[in-house]
């Protein structure tokens, strides 16, 4: 860091940057999971009116597996629930980190305004 900055202020700045990176990473994770949720919703909409015993294929990793509509709806519903949980947990973590970030930002502003080094 720059000359004349106290080790405490330097630590706060590093923590501030770290929190900023964590927030950015969480935002990206949340966005990615929400996109997955949209894909599941589209798939469920496509098959909603089909008979439960009709055959279909579902993607498992790089494989396509023969299934039926009923089983596929169940699996997609389970995935959707899992993604909903992941989004809620990530958003909760984001809010916690955001609070820490804002508190630290206020501390840094106060330190800079008071001329602390």
Regions found by a protein language model. Give the residues of each.
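Generic alpha-helical secondary structure signal
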Residues: 7-10, 70, 74
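Amphipathic alpha-helical coiled-coil segments
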Residues: 12, 16-26, 30-33, 37-40, ...
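Short, charged, low-complexity amphipathic alpha-helix
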Residues: 1-16
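Short coil/loop "hinge" linkers that interrupt or connect long alpha-helical coiled-coils or helical hairpins
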Residues: 46-71
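Short acidic DE-rich linear segments
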Residues: 1-4, 110-117
């Amino acid at each position: 860091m720059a000359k004349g900055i106290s080790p405490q202020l330097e630590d706060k700045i590093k923590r501030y940057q770290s929190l900023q990176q964590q927030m950015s990473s969480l935002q990206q994770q949340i966005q990615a999971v929400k996109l997955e949720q949209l894909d599941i919703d589209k798939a469920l909409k496509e098959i909603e009116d089909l008979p439960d015993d009709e055959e279909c294929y579902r993607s498992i990793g790089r494989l396509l597996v023969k299934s039926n509509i009923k089983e596929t709806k169940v699996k997609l519903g389970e995935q959707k629930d899992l993604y909903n949980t992941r989004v809620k947990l990530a958003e909760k973590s984001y809010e916690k980190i955001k609070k820490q970030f804002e508190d630290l930002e206020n501390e840094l502003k106060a330190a800079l305004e008071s001329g602390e080094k």
